[in-house]
Amino acid sequence: MAFVSIAPLASRCCVHKSFVSSREVKPLCRTIPTLGRCRRGKTVTPSISMCWTATVLDDGVQRRIANHHSNLWHDSFIQSLSTPYGETSYLERADKLIGEVKEIINSISVEDGELITPLNDLIQRLSIVDNIERLGIDRHFKNEIKSVLDYVYSYWNEKGIGCGRESVITDLNSTALGLRTLRLHGYPVSSDVLEQFKDQNGQFACSAIQTEGEIKSVLNLFRASLIAFPGEKVMEDAEIFSTIYLKEALLTIPVCSLSREIAYVLEHGWHTNLPRLEARNYIDVFGQDPIYGTPNIKMTQKLLEIAKLEFNIFHSLQQKELKHLSRWWKDSVFSQLTFPRHRHVEYYTLASCIDIDPQHSSFRLGFAKISHLGTVLDDIYDTFGTMDELELFTAALKRWHPSATKWLPEYMKGVYMMLYETVNEMAREADKSQGRDTLNYARQAWEAYIDSYMKEAKWISSGFLPTFEEYLDNGKVSFGYRIGTLQPILTLGTPFPHHILQEIDFPSSLNRLACSILRLKGDIHTYQAERSRGEKSSCISCYMKDNPGSTEEDAVTYINAMVNKSLKELNWEFLRPDSNAPITSKKHAFDILRAFYHLYKHRDGFSVARNEIRNLVKTTVIEPVPL
């Protein structure tokens, strides 16, 4: 939320010298413990602890900065990156292997062989699909995957399936993997099939000794349980049981491919799992242990080589796109501003972790640019900007014309023009895909985004603490999920007619749930830092206001329960078979939620990018896979 004061238009420690006014700037590096009246008619509650570095200029007015760490990925480093995997020979080798694997899969579909029989054909087919998807190469095998899943579904019944079409009894591993895979592809399958695997006490049964096969079955049960819909108690029971079981297994089994997979799945689950990160991890475990291989050794070897080649071929494209993005940032006003978070590389990494299609460069770069713009505006409205400046910027944005900059302070002029040019450029790109004007969609989203920030600024200026419901309604917009989603998905090259777009964009249930989840989860990790900067309102503080006597721990527990409930509702909105929008049309919107949610797994990954997110950049963008 924005700080309310009048400050000169620039500060030496926050803005490049070309933006500094002619008046002398006197830096003061100390902590301001309290702050009373800032300007006539505007106050900030003196009891709020102000724990930031303030800059005092010659008129004694202060401007806040949040002391975020600087850009971790310098342009000189990005421009120095190189890779040989863009050469034609690698592409040709990958294409050849893909063709050979398709032939093997199609031959399996026609008739049983020596290794695939009527007693194991269902689990073998499901395992092939699962391996292909987890290796990140499924875009090459869409038809083959559909053929396999149609075959498996033809044998699905109210008790699930056995290992093969002629199996006498159903099997937990086959049923759990089938439930997960079929549900993710839109087949109407009920979780009731899991009830039969409980004992007379209503508990999932397991043997006294954990065998490798049983551990693998429980792992697939855990993976299936994460794709739960509202009201599916058996899925909740399955998640609780399998989580405990797998954590115990990690304590007893030696370090191996299976233990690494268990650790990864427990860590990332589904909602914080990113496809490219999963592929990088699965490449390391696939093929190194018989439990992961396909019945055809040649297929296993070919799939592994395809996965490595695809990872590195896309790596070469990532470098080209990242160099473009880094130049865009360096040549813009952003590189001259030191007060905001510079996270363009991190945002690009998230986009490239959820979409590796070579044709979708506009999506990846657009997501990175739009998200970076949103973050810069977040820091302007939250800390650096004064109320007068914010009102001017809000009015200028709604006018949407370059001439509107003449009323803005210098540092805002550059930001405004970058926003104006980037949004218009993306709209022109989206117009080609959609066959209609899309700029109005974008402008409406940005206006709502900025209005939500102005509301928060007014709350802090008056010392007003809203109700939990009022705060959340506004916070769902100010998180910025809509601006980060709308324009990028419209550039994908896939038409989004109105009846499809209304299932994805505001005010659809999918959009509402995604925004709620991200705002709630985000506040859990940011409220303490924001409170130290004088930003009073958060889901936690508003809940405590509505529930006198409650503690921060009570609030966090309540909010986590809300998030878990909303995630199940989101699963349903994404995967429901009766939706007007196919899963493929909703996938990017859903995956963008997963990308943002990934950053809040352990901390505020937007503000503190030195830890997990830095490793994500290195693992999925900077470093290739050894062939």
Swiss-Prot record:
**Sequence motif DDXXD motif, location on chain:** 378-382
Tell whether S-adenosyl-L-methionine is among the UniProt keywords.
no
The residues that hold Mg(2+) 1 are 378, 382
Provide the alphabetized UniProt keywords.
Chloroplast, Lyase, Magnesium, Metal-binding, Plastid, Transit peptide
Instruction: Keyword check for Transmembrane, yes or no.
Output: no
What EC number(s) are associated with this protein in UniProt?
4.2.3.26
The record's CDD domains line, in alphabetical order, gives:
Terpene_cyclase_plant_C1
Record GO cellular component, one term: chloroplast
Q: Which residues does the record give as Mg(2+) 3 binding sites?
A: 530
Task: Tell me which residues form the transit peptide.
Answer: 1-21
Q: Which reaction does it catalyse?
A: (2E)-geranyl diphosphate + H2O = (R)-linalool + diphosphate
| Principal location listed in the UniProt entry | plastid
Which InterPro entries does UniProt cross-reference here? Isoprenoid_synthase_dom_sf (IPR008949), Terpene_cyclase-like_1_C (IPR034741), Terpene_cyclase_plant_C1 (IPR044814), Terpene_synth_N (IPR001906), Terpene_synth_N_sf (IPR036965), Terpene_synthase-like (IPR050148), Terpene_synthase_metal-bd (IPR005630), Terpenoid_cyclase/PrenylTrfase (IPR008930)
Kindly report, in one word, the top-level EC class recorded for this enzyme: lyase
Q: Which PANTHER family match?
A: (E,E)-GERANYLLINALOOL SYNTHASE, ENT-COPALYL DIPHOSPHATE SYNTHASE, CHLOROPLASTIC
Q: What is known of its domains?
A: The Asp-Asp-Xaa-Xaa-Asp/Glu (DDXXD/E) motif is important for the catalytic activity, presumably through binding to Mg(2+).
Q: Give the protein's biological function.
A: Terpene synthase (TPS) involved in the biosynthesis of monoterpene natural products included in conifer oleoresin secretions and volatile emissions; these compounds contribute to biotic and abiotic stress defense against herbivores and pathogens. Catalyzes the conversion of (2E)-geranyl diphosphate (GPP) to (R)-linalool.
Q: What is this protein called?
A: (R)-linalool synthase 1, chloroplastic
Natural source organism: Picea sitchensis
The coding gene here is TPS-Lin-1
